[in-house]
Structure formats: C-alpha cells, structure tokens
Amino acid sequence: MPLQYGLHEMSIATSVLDALRAESALHGGARVTRAGLRIGELSGVAVESLRFCLEMLVADTDLAALGFEIEFAPWTRRCRACAAVFRVSDARPECTACGSQDTEAAGGDQMELSFLELEEP
C-alpha cells in the first residue's frame, strides 16, 4: 500500500520549504544543503508523512539534494517544586523525581526548524 500523506503535513512541508528559501535569499542565494526539524510528540504531525511530503516537494527543484533530519521531541514536563524535567509516559503528570503534581509543560508540542546548513554561492 502506498504511503499516504495528509493535507496538514503537506501544508507544513510547504511552509518549511518557504522558510528555507527565505533564509537562502537572506544569505545572498546560498544553497541550502541540510535542514533539521524538531517535531514534538504532541504536535499532531505524522513524521513519516511529513518526510514523504518534503521529499515529494523538493524533487526536481533547486532543493532536490537537500538532506532533512527530523528529530522527535518527547512530551516533557517541569516540576515547579524541584525543577526536574521528566518525560511523560502516560496522562499522569506527577514529577518522577519528587512526586509533586505541581508541574508545567516543558516540551513536546514544538514544531521548529532546529538547524540549517548553507553553502555560499
């Protein structure tokens, strides 16, 4: 069965490529050679679908040789009592260090460009 992609991931992929082209223009048309994305567990993004969309959109373009690295960012919380940051393994947000329930979101909802490598023209 062929890999399916969603409109959500296609829209994100299009936005990523627009951002890469804008960065290239800011650097005098430097060629983008690698780009990294950090996608959070809670972002709602299907990573393999996003990868497929990116590869499909760059085929036969100036970005065809671009290498993408997609990093998964787990759902984490920070304890307000002891400052520990811990991965959430279920819906119970208790601190794994001290047991406090006074916690706040620390990560896992992000969707960001984490790095960019350019080759000057």
Question: Where are the regions a protein language model picked out?
Answer:
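Short, flexible, mixed-charge glycine/proline-rich loop motifs
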Residues: 67-74, 84-90
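Short loop/turn motifs enriched for small/polar and acidic residues
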Residues: 38-42, 71-75, 116
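Cys/His-enriched microdomains
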Residues: 77, 93, 111
